[in-house]
Amino acid sequence: MTDKLTSLRQITTVVADTGDIAAMKLYQPQDATTNPSLILNAAQIPEYRKLIDEAIAWAREQSSDHAQQIVDATDKLAVNIGLEILKLIPGRISTEVDARLSYDTVASVAKAKRLIKLYNEAGISNDRILIKLASTWQGIRAAEQLEKEGINCNLTLLFSFAQARACAEAGVFLISPFVGRILDWYKANGDKKEFAPHEDPGVVSVTEIYQYYKKHGYKTVVMGASFRNLGEIIELAGCDRLTIAPSLLKELAESEGPVERKLAYTGEVQAKPTPLTEAEFYWQHNQDPMAIDKLADGIRKFAIDQGKLEKMISDLL
């Protein structure tokens, strides 16, 4: 009998949400996603020590200023890990822009181009890279500019329908709506503590976004992210892509039985609405207390881990 991971792959592109090379070799995903937290975890893996040493040596060659060396080495380490992962996957690596730039369009564009340049210098073309940006208004504007310059983007920390709509209207390549973190918020802030998979607020959110995109003919890829259990994944089978942590990839691979398509749009494509203005975006996003909390919390957490990574690099310089 076929295992659930093999079955899921027939209807959805499976992406690995990890920086762990061993997991890549084991589960052979199409693409991979990283973020500051995953890079920090990956940096603890002994096999990656040479990548850290190389990044530090390179940073020392670029500048004699300690603060600049930290920035350079951190960027280079993220790219070095991405390069190792790209050896094992046929598709794309997602590398994230510093979360502390989430409200600065100009700085986000500059950092994205810096990361792309490092990949290009290592012989990797733009079509194998996605630049991850937080789905703030400023991050979406940065992505809009980058897309026009041939740099595809993955808009992350997406929790509200307003964020999803603004991303599609900006023509971004891919969005990563966070399923599990939405569930976390509702469990922590509501009376209901258990949800059937089809009632899971994160599943409901991604389903709504998927249907809206297909209904209006948006090309932006929907990639569900941040899963807490197998039920969420099974309920979103048919989504364009799903990025899944190694622990859940293992669970899927060890579970027998078919996975049936749950997401599909069979209606006619309708006209696109007038794009949201900045004021409309903020007003609609502000109506969702979960999205307000989780976007801010996600940016803070990624920024904290970026700081820890920089501290580790600083101590080694």
Curated annotation (Swiss-Prot):
Active site as annotated: K132
Alphabetical UniProt keywords: Cytoplasm, Pentose shunt, Schiff base, Transferase
One BP term from GO: pentose-phosphate shunt
MF terms (GO), sorted A to Z: transaldolase activity
Top-level division of the source organism's lineage: Bacteria
Top class in the EC scheme: transferase
Compartmental location: Cytoplasm
Binding partners and assembly: Homodimer.
Sequence similarity: Belongs to the transaldolase family. Type 1 subfamily.
Biological role: Transaldolase is important for the balance of metabolites in the pentose-phosphate pathway.
Name used for this protein in its record: Transaldolase
Organism: Yersinia enterocolitica serotype O:8 / biotype 1B (strain NCTC 13174 / 8081)
Gene it is expressed from: tal
